[in-house]
């Protein structure tokens, strides 16, 4: 009876401690991310206003010189970004792909120095006029904060919960969309649902939105609450043009990927690449300023039906290509805001074509459908994309129409490109998160962790009688023929030794090409090798030198596999 009461008390204490931890973590991240997200947005707006208006006014520049300001500002931004690379020791920029990867590892911590440096670089890029976004860097900042706090607190809550709180808080504050923040964190980053994670993540998202409204006011990006679209017209158009938006998303992602690949393959210095991007973007921006920066102002104009058809097509193509150029060549930033812009421009353009050709006048609804469809396909989060539209517009009919475009566009982009832009980034690094946490854990667990020295080694000068004696003494049925330097020469088994003449050379009767595992193999690779194996043990060999490191057996492999699977299950289902 006493033990039963103790268990009840311990269970109650555990429940209250988890509740308190979830509340504290959620509120803490909500407050921090509301400050950081709004601070980032306000800073970019201030820098944009400085670039577009204040510098020319304060310096009294004439019109010809002021027209060149986009070019000068981008050159200055490129210079500052190079300094950020040097100070923070950044060899490559970090973003949401790294957040996804970190959330799929049970023992991984994000590089906080490079994470914060990447966010600062994105702020400089967007403020300087580069055609990049803000939400990706904010998402990664939230994930980096989560990883850092987890280290400080010594892991009283798992890393994925901290990362989820940071990500949800960033989205909720950035879009004033707390529900979308919760959905995005689970759908795009964590990719699993557990009762342990949902409470702190929801608290972080809702509190981040609340703190943002209380401290910075309610400034929705879009306001279509007064517009009620005709669903009988909009829904068929949304369904019809969904694949078109999916194709636009694929072209957008391919352009960025090819730009990154070109920059990585060429032998140009980072400074040359980034200044070239600044030159091209700034020159184009002198004549088409709508493609510079985050594009929030032009986005509103597009959704309100502004710009001529030809100019709309120009800024659509220009934004797509310049975003690829900037991100690929070092003017780092996010892809989500440009995807919103490209999608809205594509939706508005096809909406006008449909109105002219087939008489389907969908108004701003098709532009919103395109915006949601392209952005959702790029980030690989269709449900979160629909929720963002719903919470930004507060219009159920538009969200319903957007859902049709989102799901059809996502199917097309998934078939032609992949799950998301971030998944493809990870695949290019040899990481397939679609296989799940278990696969990643097995790929990152070295087989050397379970290598044993419990094997019988036979010297190349020894004879058959000595080999038999060693096998019997060690109670083994297999032995390994080794050189004086430990190089594996072959594998012997008891049956072969007994069935051959005693005077026969051991090397001639040994299996000279036995099944082996390379010393730097992962658990996943070792299991794949062992699937075709029948015997006592498998040698682990350094392929460069031929030296035998030890052996593994099937029992050890599967014990480690089950241990990893149990840990992943606890993480995803608890």
What are these regions (language model features)?
Residues 429, 569-574:
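Post-kinase regulatory C-tail/linker adjacent to protein kinase catalytic domains
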Residues 458-476, 482, 499-501, 516-543, ...:
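The conserved cystathionine-beta-synthase
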Residues 418, 536-537, 548:
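Short beta-strands and strand-coil junctions in structured, solvent-facing domains, enriched
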Residues 1-444, 449, 453-454, 458-489, ...:
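Alpha-helical transmembrane segments and immediately membrane-proximal extracytoplasmic
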Residues 508-509, 520:
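Conserved SET/PR domain catalytic loop and adjacent active-site segment
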Residues 183, 387, 489-497, 549-558:
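Short hydrophobic beta-strand motif reused across regulatory alpha/beta modules
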Residues 491-494, 498, 503-506, 523:
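Nucleotide-binding motor/catalytic cores of P-loop/tubulin-like NTPases across gene-expression machines
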């Amino acid at each position: 009876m006493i033990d039963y009461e103790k268990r009840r008390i311990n269970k109650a204490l555990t429940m209250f401690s988890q509740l308190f931890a979830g509340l504290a973590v959620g509120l803490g991240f909500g407050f921090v991310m509301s400050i950081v997200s709004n601070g980032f947005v306000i800073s970019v707006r201030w820098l944009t206003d400085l670039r577009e208006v204040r510098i020319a006014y304060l310096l009294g520049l004439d019109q010809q010189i002021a027209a060149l300001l986009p070019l000068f500002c981008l050159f200055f931004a490129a210079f500052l970004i190079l300094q950020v690379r040097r100070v923070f020791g950044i060899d490559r920029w970090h973003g949401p792909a790294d957040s996804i990867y970190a959330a799929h590892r049970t023992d991984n911590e994000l590089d906080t120095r490079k994470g914060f440096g990447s966010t600062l670089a994105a702020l400089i890029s967007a403020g300087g006029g580069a055609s990049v976004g803000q939400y990706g860097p904010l998402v990664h900042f939230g994930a980096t904060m989560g990883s850092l706090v987890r280290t400080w607190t010594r892991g009283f809550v798992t890393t994925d919960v901290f990362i989820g709180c940071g990500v949800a808080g960033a989205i909720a504050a950035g879009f004033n969309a707390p529900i979308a923040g919760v959905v995005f964190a689970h759908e795009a980053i964590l990719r699993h649902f557990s009762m342990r994670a949902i409470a702190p993540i929801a608290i972080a998202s809702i509190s981040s939105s609340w703190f943002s409204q209380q401290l910075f006011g309610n400034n929705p990006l879009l306001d279509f609450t007064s517009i009620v679209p005709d669903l009988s017209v909009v829904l068929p158009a949304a369904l019809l043009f969904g694949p078109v938006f999916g194709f636009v998303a694929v072209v957008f992602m391919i352009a960025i990927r090819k730009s990154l690949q070109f920059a990585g393959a060429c032998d140009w210095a980072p400074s040359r690449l980034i200044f070239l991007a600044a030159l091209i973007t700034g020159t184009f921006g002198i004549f088409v300023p709508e493609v510079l920066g985050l594009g929030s102002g032009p986005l509103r104009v597009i959704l309100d039906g502004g710009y001529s058809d030809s100019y709309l097509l120009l800024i659509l193509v220009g934004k797509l290509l310049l975003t690829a150029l900037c991100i690929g060549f070092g003017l780092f930033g996010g892809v989500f805001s440009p995807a919103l812009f490209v999608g809205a421009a594509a939706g508005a353009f096809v909406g006008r074509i449909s109105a002219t050709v087939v008489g389907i006048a969908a108004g701003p609804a098709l532009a919103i459908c395109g915006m949601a469809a392209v952005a959702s396909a790029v980030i690989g989060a269709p449900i979160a994309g629909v929720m963002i539209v719903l919470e930004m517009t507060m219009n159920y009919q538009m969200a319903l129409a957007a859902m049709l475009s989102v799901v059809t566009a996502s199917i097309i982009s998934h078939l032609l490109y992949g799950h998301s832009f971030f998944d493809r980034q990870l695949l290019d690094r040899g990481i397939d998160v679609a296989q799940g946490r278990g696969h990643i854990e097995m790929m990152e667990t070295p087989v050397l962790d379970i290598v044993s020295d419990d094997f019988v080694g036979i010297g190349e000068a020894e004879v058959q009688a000595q080999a038999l004696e060693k096998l019997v003494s060690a109670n083994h049925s297999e032995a390994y023929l080794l050189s004086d330097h430990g190089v594996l020469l072959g594998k012997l088994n008891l049956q072969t030794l007994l069935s051959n003449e005693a005077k026969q050379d051991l090397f001639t009767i040994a299996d000279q090409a036995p099944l082996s595992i390379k010393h730097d193999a992962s658990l996943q690779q070792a299991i794949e090798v062992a699937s075709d194996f029948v015997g006592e043990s498998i040698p682990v060999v350094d392929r460069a030198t031929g030296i035998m490191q030890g052996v593994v057996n099937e029992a050890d492999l599967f014990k480690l596999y089950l241990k990893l699977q149990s840990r992943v299950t606890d993480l995803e289902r608890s």
